[in-house]
Amino acid sequence: MSTIIVSSPVTAGLASRFKAHGLKLKTVVLFDTNTRKLFGEQVLRTLADEGFMVHELVVPAREASKSFSTAYKLYGGMIEAGVDRSWNLLAVGGGVVGDLGGFIAASYYRGIPVIQLPTTLLAMTDSSIGGKVAINHPLGKNLIGFFHLPELVLIDPSYLGTLPEREVYSGLSEVVKYGFIADSALLERLRSHFSSIVALEEPYLTDAIRRSAEIKEAVVREDFREMSGLRATLNFGHTFAHGLEKLADYRFIRHGEAVTIGMAAALSLSRRLGFLDRPSLEQGQSIIAEFRFPRGLLKKRFLDIDAPALLENMLSDKKKLDSRLRFVLLKALGEAFLLEEDVDDREVLGAIEDAKTFFRKQ
C-alpha cells in the first residue's frame, strides 16, 4: 500500500523519502496552471536543492485536461525529454492533476511510480489516496483508467491556505463522509470544531485530514479492486450526487457540494427503510446543517429540480454498469453498508423530497 505522510513542510527531506522507497531522483513534475503559479517555485527549488533530475509539465487548470488529447501531448513531451521507466511522476494539484498524473504514470512504459502531492482538501482526503486514476470520455467522467497506487502521498495542510472557502467546504464533505461510514468519534469532533476546521485552524485541520486518510487507506487495503463491497461504502451519498452533477452537466456545482446534498438524502433513505433511528438521523443532519453553499446554488441546482428528473439522471448514470441503483446506507452513525436489494422508486423520491425539506429549513 501507499505510504501517507502528513506534515508541514512535507517536501523537506524529499530525496531521503524517495530513496527509502526505492525511487530514483528522476522525476516528472506535473502541475496545472494554478498549482504551478502557487507552488511551482517552492517545489522545483526543493527538488533542485536535493539533487533531483526534473522534467516539468503544466496543463490547463480545468476538467477538460483529463483527456486523451492532453495525455498524448504529455507522453510526447516525456519521450522527447528521454524519460524512461527509471523515472517517477510527481503530481502536484487537486483531483484533475492527481487523476491525470496517475493515468500517465500507470500507462507510460507500462507503468512508472507515481507520487501524489495534493493541494486541495478534497484531494488530500480522498482522490489522492487509493489508486483510482482515470481520464474522461465524451460519454462520461472517469471511464478510462487504472488501479495504480501511489508510492507516496505527501500531504501538507499549509497548502490549503490558498483555497477559497467554497473549496474548503467542498473538501469537508468527504471528511464528514468518513465519519458517517466508519467513525462516529470523528463526527463528534467535526461537530465540535467545524468552524475551526473551515478556518483551517490547527490542530483540528490536521486531525481531520489524518483521520480521513487513515480511513480511506484502511478501506482500500481491504478491498483494493472493489470485490467485497467494502470500498463501495466510500460512495455514501454519491448515488444522489452523481445525478445532481449530471443534471448540471458536470459544471456549476462542485463534487463536494453534490455529495453534501447526497448525504442528506442518503441519511433520509436509511431512515425510511428502517435501518437508521431518528436520533441518529437528526444528529447526522445537524452536521450537514453546518455546510454553506454559494448564493442561489442550492435553490437552482437542487431545490428547484423535480425529484423524478433527479432519479432519472441517477438511473441513467448507472445503466452503464447494471440495471439498478445501488445505495450505501447507514445502520448507525459510523456504520455503513452496501444495500444489495432493489429500492422502491417511491422511497428514493421520498428521500429526495425529505432532503429538500431539510435544506429549505436551513
From Swiss-Prot:
Residues bound to NAD(+): 95-99, 119-120, 132, 141
InterPro entries listed in its UniProt record: Dehydroquinate_synthase (IPR050071), DHQ_synth_AroB (IPR016037), DHQ_synth_fam (IPR030963), DHQS/DOIS_N (IPR030960), DHQS_C (IPR056179)
Name this protein carries in UniProt: 3-dehydroquinate synthase
Cofactor stoichiometry and binding remark: Binds 1 divalent metal cation per subunit. Can use either Co(2+) or Zn(2+).
Reaction(s) the record says it catalyses: 7-phospho-2-dehydro-3-deoxy-D-arabino-heptonate = 3-dehydroquinate + phosphate
Principal subcellular localization: cytoplasm
EC category: lyase
GO CC, any one term: cytoplasm
Entry superkingdom: Bacteria
